[in-house]
A protein has these predicted regions:
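Structured loop/turn residues at beta-strand edges in well-structured enzyme cores
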Residues: 1, 64, 117
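NAD(P)+-binding Rossmann beta1-loop-alpha1 motif at the extreme N-terminus of oxidoreductases
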Residues: 1-58
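Short glycine/serine/threonine-rich phosphate/pyrophosphate-binding segments
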Residues: 16-17, 78-81, 104-106
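A structural alpha-helix within SAM-dependent methyltransferase catalytic domains
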Residues: 20-23, 64, 88, 110
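A generic structural signal for alpha->beta connector loops
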Residues: 26, 51-53, 94, 116-119
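Hydrophobic/aromatic residues located in beta-strands of well-ordered beta-sheets
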Residues: 29, 69, 97-98, 119
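Rossmann-like NAD(P)-binding element
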Residues: 34-41, 48-97
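Rossmann-fold dinucleotide-binding core
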Residues: 98-134
């Protein structure tokens, strides 16, 4: 699978930074957040060269049919669980869904998302130099 369309769920520091970097490398990026003021703030913090290359949305459906979505939703478990409950019902079955971190992962009452695939926790990143703009 070739990754061309990337969704970022959550427009906080980690989310808008990822969107900025992916857009600077030419990917089609959609940045989603459940709160419009957070998206507006993210727009002001993303580099000018990337800002207009990113689609900003509060509509969850806009990221449900992309190649990969990276979840960066706030660590408020009620909000995070609400995101997964809604998103997993509409996401394409062959989409890659990744998460940066779930603080209380071990305390989750059950599966986060009924999906095919493998969850790699504590994955080792051998080298990110090829992807870093710095």
């Amino acid at each position: 699978m070739e990754i061309k369309r990337i969704g970022i769920a959550g427009a906080g520091t980690m989310g808008y930074s990822m969107a900025d970097i992916f857009a600077s490398y030419g990917f089609d990026v959609t940045l989603w957040n459940h709160r419009k003021p957070t998206l507006e703030r993210a727009k002001t913090l993303i580099s000018e060269t990337s800002r207009d290359k990113i689609h900003y949305t509060t509509n969850l459906e806009d990221i449900a049919h992309l190649d990969i979505v990276i979840e960066n939703v706030t660590e408020d478990m009620a909000i995070k669980e609400g995101f997964y409950e809604s998103f997993c019902k509409m996401a394409d079955a062959d989409m890659i869904l990744a998460t940066k971190y779930i603080r209380s992962f071990h305390q989750c009452p059950g599966p986060i998302c009924d999906a095919q695939g493998t969850l790699f926790r504590d994955a080792l990143v051998q080298s990110a130099d090829a992807y870093s703009p710095y």
